[in-house]
Swiss-Prot record:
Keywords from the named record: ADP-ribosylation, Cell cycle, Cell division, Cytoplasm, Cytoskeleton, Disulfide bond, Glycoprotein, Golgi apparatus, Immunoglobulin domain, Membrane, Mitosis, Repeat, Signal, Transmembrane, Transmembrane helix
Function: Required during prometaphase for centrosome maturation. Following poly-ADP-ribosylation (PARsylation) by TNKS, translocates from the Golgi apparatus to mitotic centrosomes and plays a key role in the formation of robust microtubules for prompt movement of chromosomes: anchors AKAP9/CG-NAP, a scaffold protein of the gamma-tubulin ring complex and promotes centrosome maturation.
Name the UniProt record assigns to this protein: HEPACAM family member 2
Membrane-topology annotation of the record: Single-pass type I membrane protein
Length: 462
């Protein structure tokens, strides 16, 4: 590329001079400063690449000269193009590839190809009271962008924990200067006792696989101009069972003992961490004998149908891929807590029952009192007695106080006299003649009293 490291004359005002390239690169730079944003620029093959350059000075300048050189390792720098003030003098071999717009010292490379990779040197000379020079070097790399990587797993059917191994390989169709990195759950994977990598880092070996190796794996591929990440892939690892335990929806659990209320139906659930899912079996233990009562992860026990108050069970989990199994023992104790709760519930309702009973008693009493007031049963009885025939009254005898009590049946009527001390009781029989005069008033009173007794005096002999 370009001519040798000797410069041609640039105009009559500068005069004729020749020097070697390395002398130009290390010229004086007092009062002149050349800067570049980055000393390394990465370009994409087939695209344009812009190399920005800035310079400044503080002295009067009559002429500004800009020179671009290109060098590769172990080769001499080659001239690309130069300018004095606004006049550009390109190398005819590359006049359509490199572009510069003085006094701007930046360089445009279009299109960028792999041979364009190397070091680009820019030198600025200022002519005034003297000549000031400064230069910068920019390293340019050229790459193809990375295409999306694809990860393959071997064996694709999976591996058994502590028995099988697994290999993950990252494939990329396009890209240069590729750098591979493996990620697990979004974090970098490092070398360990089970992880190892190929020299290019595009292959990950896991030997042997364990449950902890389960996760989302991806391959990140990058180069100076791009990066791409593969789709997430999860290796299949068979493990377990781990952490076998039994839980229930009811009852109290203390250790391996479940306390269940009498009359409750309790559902037990047996679970363990495993892949693929386990096969569960429920075993009942009685009198040193065991027998399988059910298959599946759940068991329902109806406590009211169980004759024993204490029952022993075993839940067994088996993984048919790993060939491992585990079991857990537990005891079920049936108590009468449910009945006590029911009795307490009845006691809690007793005040309400008492109030209800008292209310019913009062209502019934009021109804009976109302019926008694309305119909008065004693009057009915009296009317029936008064309506008896006279023959029954004739049978009644006077009260003498000495006859047999069986002969005293009859109807009596007693009268209270105002003067009890002055009047003596007169029997219902006839009064002697000696007493008739003194007891006339009394007799008439007695007669009025006893006249209510039908025909009792007529039947008495005179």
């Amino acid at each position: 590329m370009g001519q040798d490291a000797f410069m041609e004359p640039f105009g009559d005002t500068l005069g004729v001079f020749q020097c070697k390239i390395y002398l130009l690169l290390f010229g004086a730079c007092s009062g002149l400063k050349v800067t570049v944003p980055s000393h390394t620029v990465h370009g994409v093959r087939g695209q344009a690449l812009y190399l920005p350059v800035h310079y400044g000075f503080h002295t009067p300048a009559s002429d500004i000269q800009i020179i671009w050189l290109f060098e590769r390792p172990h080769t001499m720098p080659k001239y690309l193009l130069g300018s004095v003030n606004k006049s550009v003098v390109p190398d005819l071999e590359y006049q359509h590839k490199f572009t510069m717009m003085p006094p701007n010292a930046s360089l445009l490379i279009n299109p960028l190809q792999f041979p364009d990779e190397g070091n680009y040197i820019v030198k600025v000379n200022i002519q005034g009271n003297g000549t000031l020079s400064a230069s910068q070097k920019i390293q340019v790399t050229v790459d193809d962008p990375v295409t999306k990587p694809v990860v393959q797993i071997h064996p694709p059917s999976g591996a058994v924990e502590y028995v099988g191994n697994m290999t993950l390989t990252c494939h990329v169709e396009g890209g240069t200067r590729l750098a591979y990195q493996w990620l697990k759950n979004g974090r970098p994977v490092h070398t360990s006792s089970t992880y190892s990598f190929s020299p290019q880092n595009n292959t990950l070996h896991i030997a042997p696989v364990t449950k902890e190796d389960i996760g989302n794996y991806s391959c990140l591929v990058r180069n100076p101009v791009s990066e791409m990440e593969s789709d997430i892939i999860m290796p299949i690892i068979y493990y377990g069972p781990y952490g076998l335990q039994v839980n229930s929806d009811k009852g109290l659990k203390v250790g391996e003992v479940f306390t269940v209320d009498l009359g409750e139906a309790i559902l037990f659930d047996c679970s363990a961490d495993s892949h693929p899912p386990n096969t569960y079996s429920w075993i009942r233990r009685t009198d040193n004998t065991t027998y399988i009562i059910k298959h599946g992860p759940r068991l329902e026990v109806a406590s009211e149908k169980v004759a024993q108050k204490t029952m022993d069970y075993v839940c067994c989990a088996y993984n048919n891929i790993t060939g491992r199994q585990d079991e857990t023992h537990f005891t079920v104790i049936i108590t009468s807590v449910g009945l006590e709760k029911l009795a307490q519930k009845g006691k809690s309702l007793s005040p309400l029952a008492s109030i209800t009973g008292i209310s019913l008693f009062l209502i019934i009493s009021m109804c009976l009192l109302f019926l008694w007031k309305k119909y008065q049963p004693y009057k009915v009885i009296k009317q029936k007695l008064e309506g008896r025939p006279e023959t029954e009254y004739r049978k009644a005898q006077t009260f003498s106080g000495h006859e047999d009590a069986l002969d005293d049946f009859g109807i009596y009527e007693f009268v209270a006299f105002p003067d009890v001390s002055g009047v003596s009781r007169i029997p219902s029989r006839s009064v002697p003649a000696s007493d008739c005069v003194s007891g006339q008033d009394l007799h008439s009173t007695v007669y009025e009293v006893i006249q209510h007794i039908p025909a009792q005096q007529q039947d008495h002999p005179e």
